[in-house]
């Protein structure tokens, strides 16, 4: 599995530090993703066809944002230990299965990645080294998720 590797300590530190800076921005992150990619929002039965501006400040939106972005935070937290690799793989596999049943595409995961990276860049000091660390973190996650989507 060429993409499956344990990030080194430096990469983990960078990913976790930059994540920490935005980890409580759940609503804003999900809003940013939906605003940039209405096709992703359309996959959420609770939100499909609704006005994003009207739902952004609702409890339903906050709960969903907390779940989605919280999952991502769990992944980032688990990155720090080689003993967590099986748990990470299981978490990502289950995410892939869930999203496959909802018809989520690799392209939509790519859109999420693009928007999340832009959000992270906008809320952190950013450089090529941090960018590389996040690329590795996304590649690791997507290697498992895409394996499921393609099965």
Swiss-Prot record:
Gene3D superfamilies with a match to the protein in the record: Globins (1.10.490.10)
A GO term, aspect molecular function: heme binding
Residue stretches making up the Globin domain: 6-150
Annotated heme b binding sites: 64, 99
GO cellular component: extracellular region; hemoglobin complex
Similarity comment: Belongs to the globin family.
Official protein name in the record: Globin CTT-X
Organism expressing this protein natively: Chironomus thummi thummi (Midge)
């Amino acid at each position: 599995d060429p993409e499956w590797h344990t990030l080194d300590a430096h990469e983990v530190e960078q990913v976790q530090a930059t994540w920490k800076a935005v980890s409580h921005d759940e609503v804003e992150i999900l809003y940013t993703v939906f605003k940039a990619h209405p096709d992703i929002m359309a996959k959420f039965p609770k939100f499909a066809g609704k006005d994003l501006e009207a739902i952004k400040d609702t409890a339903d939106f906050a709960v969903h944002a907390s779940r989605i972005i919280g999952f991502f935070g769990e992944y980032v937290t688990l990155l720090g230990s080689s003993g967590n690799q099986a748990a990470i793989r299981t978490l990502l596999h289950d995410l892939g299965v869930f999203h496959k049943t909802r018809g989520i595409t690799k392209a939509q995961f790519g859109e999420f990645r693009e928007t999340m990276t832009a959000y992270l860049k906008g809320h952190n000091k950013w450089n090529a080294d941090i960018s590389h660390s996040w690329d590795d973190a996304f590649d690791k996650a997507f290697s498992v998720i895409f394996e499921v989507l393609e099965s």
